[in-house]
């Protein structure tokens, strides 16, 4: 492993060690470009590869998951991933306050109810956000909860980390359940112990219940020196609530630690519980959500009304890596993960007309961003949803580029609203409606059936190209 003072990838200077695992070590580091202080997780590639495909999958899954959920204020953010011939580097947000568990110990073993409630609010907000992205943590425990030091004296803010054991919704089997047994014994849900398949969301809720109990009581609800006895207590939901728990706290804990996953409280029910509602304020919409009443910037009057032309370098930059076959389909993605690419031989006027038809049937209004000129429709349109979604109304831009007189690329991107709702619209409505006018390569058609979120254009575990 590198030593203090080492400069990695000509970008970050490593500082003191913050911790280590079997295959990795975490350092405080400084960006040589911005001067920002970050945390860098250094993974030994050779050791990870020797550990087998499971470790490789875990590392790649962690990258994919952190990119899905890392913009939430209560989730540790992944800035970038780099790789050399021997090492993989995760550059992450530095959380200066350390583990929540250390703060718990320093406070005498347990927290006051108001402090515990504040951290629990933030934990639930992060977990709910992850679930909305189809991500289930599966290893929630105080060691994986960090607290930043915001300098306000208010105790800092919670940050969820370590997504190495997380599952994506695509990991479910045909029965709609997860089947991989994982997690830390004291925090694991009874249905995971039973190995009969489980719902990732309800399993995470159980772990949240164990964490809340620990924060309020100062000890775990389920503990025994004999692991099988402890599992028996977990399976039966056998625990005792301390005398100092308030009635509302007792009520919530009993719902969280319900051994029956079908009757266990859900997050939607949890946020309405009297104990949780005290002092809880709904988080404002994300700052990157566009204001819907914001006027469109006027198009440049000198702009050519024909579709913008793309040269070979533009096409390569829009495709996945250098495999252009991924473009000629109704399932392409640009290098920006939220953008969708469609390639067609139909003229721009036909494309715009089809988008207008989709908008009319799917509760969108259409605003053309360029006006008609000599039988050519505008080459960019905005689809504005009028239904309220998770993050307001969905807004989508579609821009048409001319590759040749018989080949057009349509780039579709979200400008406002929730990412998952946008992806659902693309999968359920947009692609099927464009299928008959788009080109599809045989390779892409075959792979569409089992599509997973891309981790990166080139896996950090793959060998560098010569």
From Swiss-Prot:
Residues 297-329 form the NAF domain. ATP binds at residues 18-26, 41. The activation loop within the kinase domain is the target of phosphorylation/activation by upstream protein kinases. The PPI motif mediates the interaction with the ABI (abscisic acid-insensitive) phosphatases. Its cofactor is Mn(2+). Residues 12-276 form the Protein kinase domain. Residues 337-366 are annotated as: PPI. Residues 162-191 are annotated as: Activation loop. This is CBL-interacting protein kinase 20. Induction: By drought stress and abscisic acid (ABA). GO terms for biological process: signal transduction. Residues 446-466 are annotated as: Disordered. The gene is CIPK20. It is an enzyme of class 2 (transferase). Transmembrane segments: none annotated.
